[in-house]
Amino acid sequence: ARIQTASRAIGITQSACGLAIKYANDRHQFGKKIIKFPRVYNKLAMMVVELMVSRQLTYYAAEQKDNNKRCDLEAGMAKLLSSRVAWSAADNSLQIHGSYGYALEHPASRLLCDARIINIFEGTAEIQANVISRRILSNSINEKNIS
């Protein structure tokens, strides 16, 4: 279930990235597209990088699960990271949209609400951190498996 929740978070992140990129490409301010402003393109760059990292970790956790391997550590990591990335991406997307994105009927606003609840589903971020810490500190994990 944590892998599935991580996947949902990735979907939110992808949507947030797509909305933000489209809007930044379409919106003009001070005679140029806002995607040309460093604060906007830096936000977009980090959104895409974080999306890729969380997606790859989730794929890895799913692969472990598909191969009937223990994956509670990887699933917890994927859920924790993907949820945080979804929240950050949704927040950045709303920021790029400005007050327009804050309107309740706007998709950017909806994504922020969806990203918030993803942080709670299948265990809060604090619970995920506990799961990860317990596995890392347990005798069943050695240094070789973590790196």
Model-identified regions with their sequence ranges:
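Alpha-helical interface subdomain recognition
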Residues: R2-S147
